[in-house]
A protein has these predicted regions:
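Carbohydrate-active catalytic/glycan-binding domains of CAZyme proteins
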Residues: 1-139
């Protein structure tokens, strides 16, 4: 079943639920002249009539982007990361409200750091210790 129909090409959707139970549906527009990340906000993912579309793009750049991932930091701030694939870097933007994102850092995608459409998960200290034991740092 189709989750939503933007009435033109849309790819790379990421759905986040905030502390108030609101869903933030980030997606990249591929149709039309102005491509970029847009956002719907809703309380009910299964009632498209209740979705509200923000009137602007979310990314803090005019460069071509794709593969966004949104995650929350331990301090409560949010990060949107995406691939500036033509320019050869990943861009990280931060937000306190999941509405306004400001560029924090560009990281060159070269050498060992060449992510494409990645994601971030939170792990506990116990999980970190298990991972470090299973995959020791040999350098």
């Amino acid at each position: 079943k189709v989750l939503f129909d933007f009435h033109s090409a849309a790819i790379d959707t990421d759905i986040i639920q905030d502390e108030d139970g609101m869903y933030h549906v980030f997606f990249k527009t591929e149709g039309g002249r102005k491509k970029g990340y847009r956002q719907y906000i809703t309380k009910d993912l299964h009632n498209f009539a209740s979705w509200g579309l923000l009137p602007y793009n979310c990314e803090d750049t005019h460069k071509a982007v794709e593969g966004a991932g949104v995650f929350q930091l331990i301090d409560g701030d949010w990060v949107m990361m995406y691939d500036c694939y033509i320019d050869g870097h990943y861009q990280f933007c931060t937000s306190k409200d999941l509405i306004t994102f400001k560029r924090k850092q560009d990281t060159a995608t070269k050498g060992m750091f060449t992510p494409r459409h990645g994601t971030v998960i939170t792990i506990t200290k116990k999980e970190l210790k298990r991972l470090e034991k299973a995959f020791p740092n040999t350098k």
